[in-house]
Regions:
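Acidic metal-coordinating catalytic centers involved in nucleic-acid phosphodiester chemistry
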Residues: 1-12, 64-318, 331-335, 339
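Catalytic centers of nucleases
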Residues: 15, 19-83
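Short, hydrophobic/amphipathic alpha-helical patches that form generic packing surfaces
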Residues: 21-30, 316-340
Length: 344
């Protein structure tokens, strides 16, 4: 996307379509993903996360490109965010978000080395607390300081959105350190969702939409070689291309069938609970005990019916399918754990 003219005093400092507001909205959502039901962006600076209990978190995003400008200018922008936040008396959190390192002075500076740094109001120095309270009283802002938080998000330089990429990668590495997709692609999909929401004043972004994109990216990037390695399968290299051809279509189609998925994963859970194998051996030991020639689905047998080693190849592929379903279950659970997300 083409870069637009930058307004250094608004939330809309841009990099390839990533406005600071969009980054801030996504981060607020991800940091509260376990509790979130929906979120939205409103106007040019407002961010709202609606929780499962229908309570809400309100945030204001203020950005600037000149970190060397005098502190008072940055502080004034923080106060502008407080003006709007104070009106949201029904919110349980009120967050002022900026990319200013020192909007409150040296004593309450944010960590420049971190992509995300958070400060609760009570953790600020007494001097800063009194300054904010005094300014709020002078302007008539009735802010509940027990709910008030300040966040710093690093968003500057030639490619400011790369801070978000590193932030996401640090989370995704906990799910799958050998991921085979670009986090930039995931960010681009999320950007499109948020951009559409910014123009759509009627509907919020559902948690399931963001999570579904994440689940799909992680699982659709799974390589056949990963599953082969999981179960230490010795596959003749001359058959790898045929297996690869059948792999994506069969796995994506059949692992989505609820009955198949739940039956396999239920048996897998029972096996793991009863035998308590080492984690690195779970998949291999399970498929060896679970996969029998008589249980191979007919569509797998049909695919290999013209091969000389059709029985062994069918069994090998069936083992890969069973291992993939169990792998998928564990990946989904890892995503939920890392992002604190549970199905409604």
């Amino acid at each position: 996307m083409n870069k637009k003219e930058i307004n250094s005093s608004s939330a809309n400092a841009q990099s390839n379509g990533w406005t600071f507001q969009y980054v801030a909205a996504l981060v607020v959502f991800l940091e509260n993903m376990g509790l979130a039901k929906q979120f939205c962006v409103e106007g040019t600076e407002d961010i709202v996360v609606i929780l499962k209990n229908n309570e809400k978190i309100c945030a204001q995003a203020k950005s600037g490109l000149d970190q060397d400008s005098i502190v008072s200018l940055h502080f004034d922008r923080i106060m502008l965010s407080i003006e709007t936040l104070a009106a949201n008396t029904d919110a349980i959190q009120l967050i002022s978000i900026s990319n200013f390192h020192k909007p409150l002075g040296d004593d309450d500076a944010f960590s420049y080395m971190q992509f995300l740094d958070k400060k609760n109001f009570e953790n600020l120095t007494t001097k800063t607390q009194n300054k904010i309270k005094q300014k709020s009283e002078e302007k008539g802002y009735m802010l509940d300081f027990n709910k008030f938080k300040l966040w710093f998000i690093r968003f500057e330089g030639a490619e400011p959105e790369q801070g978000l990429a590193h932030y996401l990668n640090s989370k995704l590495e906990k799910i799958n350190p050998n991921q085979y997709f670009s986090v930039d692609d995931l960010m681009e999909k999320w950007l499109n969702i948020i951009q559409l929401n910014a123009r759509d004043k009627e509907n919020n972004i559902e948690t399931e939409m963001i999570c579904g994109t994440l689940f799909g990216k992680v699982l659709n990037s799974t390589q056949l070689s990963q599953i082969i390695k999981l179960i230490d399968l010795e596959l003749d290299p001359c058959y790898e291309e045929d297996f690869e051809r059948f792999f994506k279509n069969y796995f994506s189609r059949n692992s989505q069938i609820f009955k198949i998925y739940t039956l396999i994963t239920a048996d897998y859970d029972v096996f793991v609970n009863n035998t308590k194998p080492k984690k690195r051996e779970q998949y291999k030991l399970f498929v060896e005990s679970y996969c029998k020639q008589e249980n191979i689905p007919n569509d797998i047998k049909t695919f290999f019916e013209n091969y000389d080693e059709k029985e062994q190849l069918s069994l090998d592929f069936y083992k890969l399918f069973i291992a993939y379903v169990c792998y998928k279950k564990n990946v989904v659970n890892s995503i939920r754990e890392v992002f604190g997300y549970e199905d409604n």
